[in-house]
């Protein structure tokens, strides 16, 4: 026997028993976003490597250690997308969607990062991202946060997530803060671990969200980013907080929140849960007003967020919020000469008469007992039974699989009777 081939580590199958919960989540996400008037974009999962190095930052963990990069036959360096914003901006510039225009878009699909697989963190994972281009006020920042808050309510997890906010200011303000932070860290060089020492000169703001408790202890005395904010960023952040207060959305200002990608400025935010252990961030985003210009477009304000779908599925499972629509409503049982095609025609008739109904035909033969057992296994509510007599009389037996009651009806009236039961 040939050796079986396994899935790549950190890249998981979504099995038929798991997909209904995914479909429920994806449906809720699409419904909420659509309620705000946003339109879907679909971008390739493979992009030129320099798109991500320019957008995300050469010295970020994503670019340095986590990207799946390969050379194609033309010698071009290509990368499986590790996130969606850079590709969305590239598509907007390339297709002339951003210059002097307002765009509100969303996308959903797989992303790839070569990380150590663990609960809630995978090498292929799925994100839904929402991006707004052409608006620079705190009102649109607030709308995105309100959108996510609405989604949490729809999913029933709003009591299990909390919002953290910060403003990291303009590029100029952050450069001044960076100088002060490096000077502080150099005074405590003996406390820093190797990762923090490396980041100190390449990406010092990332030291602020270190998980090392010894480094965390000294950061209480570190310079405060809020003391270095430019007046415009301070005013923008105050406006955002006022809008969230008016909307009744609770939040905590976390001055160590900086996000892991270099393109952010001003507003940054994360939704965090305690339900998933160490992988607590389920959604994060912020402003990236310089990214469009950085990637070759005209200066365009922008803001967005992304949420990890695997982590949301894991949350729903952890909180036992897994009620999903059954995959089959009606099971068609047949036995006897010429009944198979009659059963298939009847199933089509029911599908046409009841929008959204799910009808499964039994294939493979077997007696009634075997077929009813299969109907129970797939979770059907009712069975339609066709034998030779029913086909001849143009009737069908409708069996309630929960109570066991069965009644014979004409095939013309069967759809209305099914609708009453499901």
UniProtKB/Swiss-Prot annotation:
Main location: cytoplasm
Biological processes, Gene Ontology terms: histidyl-tRNA aminoacylation
EC number(s) recorded for this UniProt protein: 6.1.1.21
Pfam families in UniProt: HGTP_anticodon, tRNA-synt_His
CDD domains: HisRS-like_core, HisRS_anticodon
Recorded catalytic activity of this chain's protein: tRNA(His) + L-histidine + ATP = L-histidyl-tRNA(His) + AMP + diphosphate + H(+)
MF (Gene Ontology): ATP binding; histidine-tRNA ligase activity
Subcellular location: Cytoplasm
Keywords from the UniProt entry: Aminoacyl-tRNA synthetase, ATP-binding, Cytoplasm, Ligase, Nucleotide-binding, Protein biosynthesis
Gene Ontology cellular component annotations, sorted alphabetically: cytoplasm
Record has Cell wall biogenesis/degradation as a keyword: no
Family: Belongs to the class-II aminoacyl-tRNA synthetase family.
Oligomeric form and interacting partners: Homodimer.
Protein name from the UniProt record: Histidine--tRNA ligase
Gene (UniProt): hisS
